[in-house]
């Protein structure tokens, strides 16, 4: 860590300046991955999983979810259930049942909300797994009536998904969980592949 003590006022803007990232090459790389996933499906996702995450595209099994449930402390389970309850209460209060208006005799107009049939959720894993994000995304999707909720999250080096992510997914009613991360996972959910 670089320590700077008592810098001159003229140096402040340079000291706090964020590094500039040239995203031109990054955008081209991302678009290339997305195009490859769109055109080659699972084969492309598997290739990028191995290249970027040193992992294999795979779905999470029921046995893995049961194993994860045993690994999560009771304190965290209780917190996840409480958070799910609170998130659900908030979103249930916003549920819209529609409005019907007879604009003139014999003519009725109405407004109706229809859920997206299938949604994809990307949950970062790694050093700071965002298991609360699972609840905040999957819970309203379930309440809205989405029939299928697909979750992608990168596995660790042993090919395992963080147990708290799996526990949150179970509580929130996620339909399918895939061990996939990065652009390739988002592309798989956006375009669909043979397995995702």
Residue ranges and their predicted role:
Residues 41, 147, 175:
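Short acidic/polar active-site loop segments enriched in Thr and Asp
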Residues 38, 152, 179:
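Active-site-adjacent beta-strand anchor residues
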Residues 31, 46, 84, 88, ...:
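Predominant activation on well-ordered alpha-helical scaffold segments within soluble catalytic domains
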Residues 173-196:
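Conserved NAD(P)+-binding/catalytic subdomain of aldehyde/semialdehyde dehydrogenases
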Residues 52, 156-157, 184:
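Positions that flank functional sites
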Residues 101-167:
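Conserved small-residue-rich beta-alpha loop and adjacent elements
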Residues 1-13, 163-173, 177:
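Active-site-proximal helix-loop elements at catalytic-domain edges
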Residues 1-117:
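N-terminal Rossmann-like NAD(P)+-binding subdomain of aldehyde/semialdehyde dehydrogenases
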